[in-house]
Amino acid sequence: MKTKLILLYGGKSAEHEVSLQTAFSVINALDLEKFEAEPIYITNEGEWVQGPLLSGKLDFVEQLRFSATDRVKLATAESEKSEGEAISPAVLEADGQETVVFPLLHGPNGEDGTVQGLFEVLNIPYVGNGVLASSAAMDKIVMKKIFADAGIPQVPAVAVRLIDWKNYQEEMVTEMEEVLTYPVFVKPANLGSSVGISKATNKTELIEAMTEAFLYDRRVVVEQGVVAREIEMGVLGNDTPVCSVPGEILPEGAVAKFYDYKAKYQDNNTALIIPTEVEPEILEQMKEYAVQAFLGLDASGLVRADFFLTEDNQLFLNEVNTMPGFTPYSMYPLLWQETGLPYGALIERLVDLAKERHAAKNALKYKLED
């Protein structure tokens, strides 16, 4: 019997469009001889819309953007099938057929542990990281504390709350200028894909960057800028994760001052070198830190570890991403392709890992014996 694969994408997030691109790529790579694929679109307003079972490849991303006027018949939790109704998340519940959810969601409400909690409540297997790893890795401040506890080197950083910024802005700026030197990068604590991130080279730009970042979150992290190579590594597995070859990001000339949202998803000016050259001892250290971060977060399925490597071979772990860009041309799938695991096989491996983790969880005891 085929595995029913529910593809969940879209979402009430600034990264809605990224999720659509990811879903389009995964759907077109699926082996429909092995999977019964069902798309579920989450609109910008948070409405869940069930699409038809897939019978072939899609031609355009827009085919995944279901609306009130072109919706298929939808199964609601309370009623018979009816035209034009949004579904309840209860549609995710398994119906006797082996079912796995593949959440192709980015950003808040997608890779921050919230939707993962829903899957846990429904006791349904799902691809990727669980509640703990997803929520911790989505929060740059919490993530940094976990890395520090594991002894993983990071660039200096200062965390700032909105309430403190409003009440003590001048004192906050003074503290940052004492701890850090320009340039610095200002980031919302709880957002991905470089959304809301700015580079500041002086006090005026710092204040402007803080104002921008606080539009997206009430907590902000300010990081020391470093002149370094940006090297990324894929991690795959559950309890015994393995690492891919390393890849390097090379933004073209002055196209982007840093690897920003547009460079990641919209431009064709960002060069990826896979595999990239790294000294053997640095490569081994990189693998060690990537696995330490994976295990420290209690991650599962997939993680992309992003490093900085300076000219004098100082290695810093910048962040990990628990749902990295996942089109065939994104860094994570390309890393595994060059390691020997093509895109379609990578998807199937992730589904297998989801089943494996779910079986292990269900084998645990949840009550004392009488």
Swiss-Prot record:
Gene3D superfamilies: 3.40.50.20, ATP-grasp fold, A domain, ATP-grasp fold, B domain
Any single biological process term in GO: regulation of cell shape
Listed InterPro entries: ATP-grasp, ATP_grasp_subdomain_1, D-Ala_lig_Van_CS, D_ala_D_ala, Dala_Dala_lig_C, Dala_Dala_lig_N, PreATP-grasp_dom_sf
GO molecular function, one term: metal ion binding
Encoding gene (name): ddl
Binding site for ATP: 177-232
Organism: Listeria innocua serovar 6a (strain ATCC BAA-680 / CLIP 11262)
Keywords: ATP-binding, Cell shape, Cell wall biogenesis/degradation, Cytoplasm, Ligase, Magnesium, Manganese, Metal-binding, Nucleotide-binding, Peptidoglycan synthesis
The protein, known as: D-alanine--D-alanine ligase
Role played: Cell wall formation.
Cofactor note: Binds 2 magnesium or manganese ions per subunit.
